[in-house]
Amino acid sequence: MTSIGASITHTDGFAVQPKDVDALLVGMGERYDVLVTLKDGVFPLVALAEGKAAAARALVRTSPQSAAPKPGQRPRELDGEVVRYAKLQPHEQVRLPQRRPDRTVRLELTGTMAAYDWAINGKKYDPETVAPVRSGERVRLSFVNRTTMWHPMHLHGHTFALPSGIRKDTVIVLPGSTLNVDFDADNPGLWMIHCHNIYHAESGMMTLLGYAAGSR
């Protein structure tokens, strides 16, 4: 949003140390709470689609006398700093206690647009394949993106901590990158891990993680 002071306060419902922001990279399923300071005028709110020329636009009007900007105007903030996860710090109340992971579950994100064969660890979703986890463990999910697209990965039933300490349940894994997140296995059940680009999940980029209460 142009010409407005903005500050991130939460991501996926968890508090962070307030961080001033020009622009955000938001994946499907991610949520951010942002406080904005409005002046008198008309301000465009613009969302660009990653990898496409399309954009969604809205206007925030605080003064009936102000003229609206031209529809094609690009807010200068879109060319400013795009805040990344590493720049955010958690509020102390939501920080996971320090602990070494008891196990690591490696999740390689694979597939191509040409074949549309999106998968995890080279295999399409199979309800009989369940990542082994035990109740009470600190589990590290290691997302390894082998594709040329970015994938917002979501874990059901839990929230996880990123290396910076912020808590989330959905995280963007950029092309060619590896991202480790940690969570506590404290909610027994059978839980989905999937790409929140739902057409990728439908193609096969999802798997299961499960454990029983008191399992050791």
Q: Can you describe what each PLM-predicted range is?
A:
Residues M1, L35-V36, G41-A47, L107, ...:
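Short, structured motif recognition centered on aromatic/hydrophobic residues
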Residues M1-V82, I166-D169:
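Histidine- and aromatic-rich segments of cupredoxin/plastocyanin-like copper-binding domains
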Residues I4, K39, E50, Q65, ...:
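Solvent-exposed coil/turn segments that connect beta secondary-structure elements
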Residues I8-D40, P127-R134, G157-G189, S215-R216:
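Extracytoplasmic beta-sandwich strand-turn segments characteristic of Greek-key/jelly-roll folds
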Residues G13-F14, A56-H151, G157-A161, K168, ...:
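Edge beta-strand plus adjacent loop/short-helix module at the start
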Residues G41-P44, A54, T147-H151, S203:
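Short loop/turn segments at connectors of secondary-structure elements within structured domains
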Residues L48-K52, V144-R146, H196-H200:
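Beta-strand-rich extracellular modules
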Residues N180-R216:
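TerminUS-proximal long segments
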